[in-house]
UniProtKB/Swiss-Prot annotation:
One of its GO terms (cellular component) is cell outer membrane. It comes from Dechloromonas aromatica (strain RCB). Keywords: Cell outer membrane, Membrane, Signal. PANTHER family: LPS-ASSEMBLY PROTEIN (PTHR30189), LPS-ASSEMBLY PROTEIN LPTD (PTHR30189:SF1). This is LPS-assembly protein LptD.
Amino acid sequence: MPGFSRRPLAVFVCCLFAGVQTGHAAADIERAMVQGESTAPAAERSVAMQLAAVSELPLNLRKERKFDVLGKKKQPAEPVAPMLAPEKPIELKKDDAYPLFIVADQIEGQADELTEAEGDVELRKVGTLIYADRLTYRPLEDEVEATGSVRMLQDGAEISGPHMRMKLADQIGSAEQVTYHIVKEVPSRFYAPQQTVVTVASSNATNSGAPMMLNVSNSYGLPTQLPPPRPSEANGYAERVEFEGENQMTLFSNTYSTCKPGQADWYMKSSETHLDYDRSEGTARNATLWFGGVPIVYTPVAGFPLSTQRRSGILHPHFSASTRSGLDISVPYYLNLAPNYDLTLVPRYMSKRGMQLGADARYVDYFYEGEARFEYLPNDEMLGRSRYGYRFEHRHNLGQGVSAALNWNGVSDDLYWQDLSSRLLQTSQAQLPRQVSLGYSPSPWLQSNLQVLRYQTLQIDPNNPVTRPYFLEPQLNLVGYKPNIWKTDFSMVGQFSRFTHVDAGKVQGDRMVFYPQLSLPIVHPAFQITPKIGLHMTKYTLDQQAAGLPESISRVLPTFSLDSTVILEREGDWFGRGYIQTLEPRLYYVNIPYKDQSQIPLFDSGLSDFNFAQIFSENRYSGYDRINDANQLTAALTTRLLDGETGVERLKAMVGQRYYFKPQRVAITGETTRQNDFSNLVAAVNGLVAPKTYADVAWEYNYRENISERFSAGVRFQPELGKVMSASYRYTRDPLTTLSTVDQVDIAGQWPISANWYAVGRYNYSLRDKRVLESIAGVEYNAGCWAVRLVGQHLGAISGAANDTVFFQLELNDFGSIGSNPIGLLRRSIPGYGKINELPTSSSLLTSQ
């Protein structure tokens, strides 16, 4: 059969149809082929461009042949009515015929047997694009052999070399003397939402807590949203490549790096590397890691990730040094046992204390989830005894409205967290809960819960002993809320509690509470009025009561409240944007008669903090052991700035005060009864005070004595991820001693100091104690495909010597890291901290507020 090159008319028509060498059409078709899109629309759009170019430029006639790969004959298209968009996407099945095009200066061969192309050859198929000097295609085997300057683009990979052979449909073949460049999109694991367990400075805080504004809603315009997936690159050279199917290849005598081509600051050199993109993992044999032209690590077998997906294997070792533990080395081993459960084993060596073993197991299912963590040090060489810590959490949906939960924590001794810097809890809490609960919700308006709750109390500071709380063994709660009952809302609380204590001499006993309430909401677009009545009933059955005190006590108190709010609005302008300002005066009246409660023990009640949440509550005490007598009115004023386009709140300011119409009679131990007819003034402001600047201020002012009882102020400026500065001040005064219990300044930030260099730090100082609670200082360098971090931490101890730690980490992007990882520390200590080698590059990610 004659060769196709002898049919000039067909060749000319094919050239017009292909049109891949003219203008922007060539780039459009190449992008479409690499991304797996159909090239037909692009080719059709380019015809007019090509015809216009013919009159101005000499037309270089080239040959093109089209194949139906699976041998199916192309059916003539039926006329179809024009549509704006298809009702659903067209799906290509595995046995459908994928069209294949070959374009070259010369094409010869036999139909359906052999085609040979030479001279600037281009093969196009959905998802695949091959360039070569010479190419042979066998349609029956669907096999291509290309020689010369071969370049293949397929599924985000670019493979170049002098020779390649491949079966296109199966993606099986080989190539020699290859340079490769692979680009995949991966999501950021660092910026993904996660729960952060933190502490704040309490009334007797002498240690460093979490900084203010650690978690700020992205509605305020700060760049806190999750960035889109970022490109992950891999490139290198291989003497030979075996293509082993879709997303599978093996490189021989190769290099591997995630740096850009020609800028390999680091690379791995190995005798064999297998890349499995289905499992998102790579495996190298006889591998040597080179950095800056110097070999730094050799391993006979190395596994590394190809994405952020989980995989089994040795995680990157962590190294650090501290004054309490000495040289600290841990080598975690991760077991991806199943998609819904995993296990991490963490052997840890501390030069001053010995060998510790840790384990972390996680699991999740449709109806339950949980996590178990355990650490064991068989022999602490500094103390001469074993030490351990554990934490177990489980939540279970048993169906039919039944749920269960377990939260069990424990350590071997009081100073376990302080000495071993454990990662079990990112907090220095002194009360470790041990709780088992069972919940039941028979209907949407009724919930019940049964729990047993105990605590392990840690006495960390001998100068400030921690009071041991009562245990609940057990407690039964019943909560109900039924709206719209003849235009009224019904709510009720029922509770039975059995209080026990480790100190057998303390009073113990049972408490029963039943508190039904009925309210009548009157709602209008401009105002709301809600009167509410209730009857608070409590009964105690006590053990170990002091002589002369009753063992059975009952208390019945009626309650009445009236809550009213008016909402006024106006439009305006703020920082060049339209906004809506609201003005919301609110009055809240409460009346509860007096009843002597001095014979009732204090199981779980205490004086609540005086703030905006508390001044709009009926009872100033927590728990149910004390119900205050009240004839009082709270007056407050709130103003908000709402975005004129979205309605999102940008700024809120509040001020309020409570007025008393009779003297206080109910009090708890240590409380000074009120002598005035009005409370302290409380005020708060939070929100966007300037572009990219968030502020949070709270103030309790005693204007009778002209002093501040409580004050906190913080500001966070963050124009973009990787640039953030924050500063805060916290002060709390003890009303009994008139001395400050908290008086701290806290400054933290991350900021670029030169090209690719970032400074990080935190300074938390106690003005009351005149000592540094925590200081962090360090630098980070982002080289594009690798980053290095050097961070020092000074952590003041509640008792004993302070702990100083140095972190050094070399991170190779999308490959691994060497050294001690300070990321967790920086994230907990610096509000808005951004990982410098995962920062988004598009300014469109940042909001304009």
